[in-house]
Amino acid sequence: MKTFSAKPAEVNKKWVIIDAKGLVVGRLATLVAMRLRGKHLPTYTPHVDCGDNVIVINAAQVVLTGRKRDNKMYYNHTGFIGGIKERSAKSILEGRFPERVLEKAIERMIPRGPLGRIQMGNLRVYAGAEHPHEAQNPEVVDIASLNRKNTRAA
């Protein structure tokens, strides 16, 4: 028996939609990253983009456990000397682009390379419940029912 190796032309990509309301960020991010890479499939091939197209809605209503909402810091650098900036997860979630907390969590679980950038392109994250992908007929994936630890009261 030969080891199966998927060809890019043989891959059938599905569209899935996940409602992030009340879900724990890290637990949601691991499951989304696994779907984006295609590791949930028996036909997974490391060098081929065989994952699904994932739509995440209500990303502004994700939950961080413990004191991470106040204490977790996100850093960026302006490019100038001494130009490191930090923002708390709370300020980002209450700010203009609250979906970035979830995007960064998922991005950091995907390999950093050409294939990883393609796989991140298959992710669409929306802060609210509205999304423009109804024409793709996405399949609903209920993350909350997989494990009781996946949800947390806000």
UniProtKB/Swiss-Prot annotation:
Gene Ontology CC: cytosolic large ribosomal subunit
Coiled coil (UniProt feature): none
GO terms for biological process, alphabetical: negative regulation of translation; translation
Record key words, sorted: Ribonucleoprotein, Ribosomal protein
Family annotation (CDD domains): Ribosomal_L13
GO molecular function terms noted in the UniProt entry: mRNA binding; structural constituent of ribosome
Gene3D superfamilies listed in its UniProt record: Ribosomal protein L13
Oligomer and partners: Part of the 50S ribosomal subunit.
Function: This protein is one of the early assembly proteins of the 50S ribosomal subunit, although it is not seen to bind rRNA by itself. It is important during the early stages of 50S assembly.
Membership in a protein family: Belongs to the universal ribosomal protein uL13 family.
Protein name as catalogued: Large ribosomal subunit protein uL13
Organism: Afipia carboxidovorans (strain ATCC 49405 / DSM 1227 / KCTC 32145 / OM5)
Chain's gene name: rplM
